[in-house]
Amino acid sequence: MADSFSLNDALAGSGNPNPQGYPGAWGNQPGAGGYPGAAYPGAYPGQAPPGAYPGQAPPGAYPGQAPPSAYPGPTAPGAYPGPTAPGAYPGQPAPGAFPGQPGAPGAYPQCSGGYPAAGPYGVPAGPLTVPYDLPLPGGVMPRMLITIMGTVKPNANRIVLDFRRGNDVAFHFNPRFNENNRRVIVCNTKQDNNWGKEERQSAFPFESGKPFKIQVLVEADHFKVAVNDAHLLQYNHRMKNLREISQLGISGDITLTSANHAMI
């Protein structure tokens, strides 16, 4: 069920010759638009920081808005975790941060940069109670990114994500740690209390006792799933009215740290 895309195809059509840099990337990645020894514009009263361009935002900055977050793989400028956007330098604070202070509200630990509370990489609020239901007001839509972070319990048996429409399940994502002594990921859809044909994935990036990050990107005709920053699989929509998918159920043998959604 894994598609044949490279990560560079995970989000097509960026048109960005250097689709790198992710402000607020997880791990120890730097934020966008930083400068050596200086904070973002505004840190030096009455002057721009070294290398700034008078009267405009420096390369890699997004004037007047928060930069986009991203599913792993190139997309809009500054989207992919890794090297920073043009003009950025390692180890510098993100927009709104000052030397010696943490990033803006919503920054994930050890990450520079931050997003509003609605962003996918907010400060973990957990552990959250499992099973956990994440409301999806207005349903899902293309370019919505759902991010789930937590830790697999020791001797885990399963993880379950269910994108629900009432009693139906539009997308069932079910890593199984021991199905007949094998590890497998099962995806399916349930309509009118009937499960459809299973799609099985042998690649299995989860480990008992280890932390994980699952990202689900909604596209017009499929879901894309990435685990720990690597594209894993895609699942074609069997329910076409995405706006009716109003809840994500999270269950299984995990400690849940955070669950968020945002548009990218």
Curated annotation (Swiss-Prot):
Residues where N-acetylalanine is found: 2
Domain Galectin: 132-262
Region named Disordered: 1-105
Biased composition regions of type Pro residues, renumbered to the chain: 47-75
Pfam families xref list: Gal-bind_lectin (PF00337)
Molecular-function GO term, any one: IgE binding
Keyword presence, Lyase: no
Name under which the protein is recorded: Galectin-3
Organism: Mus musculus (Mouse)
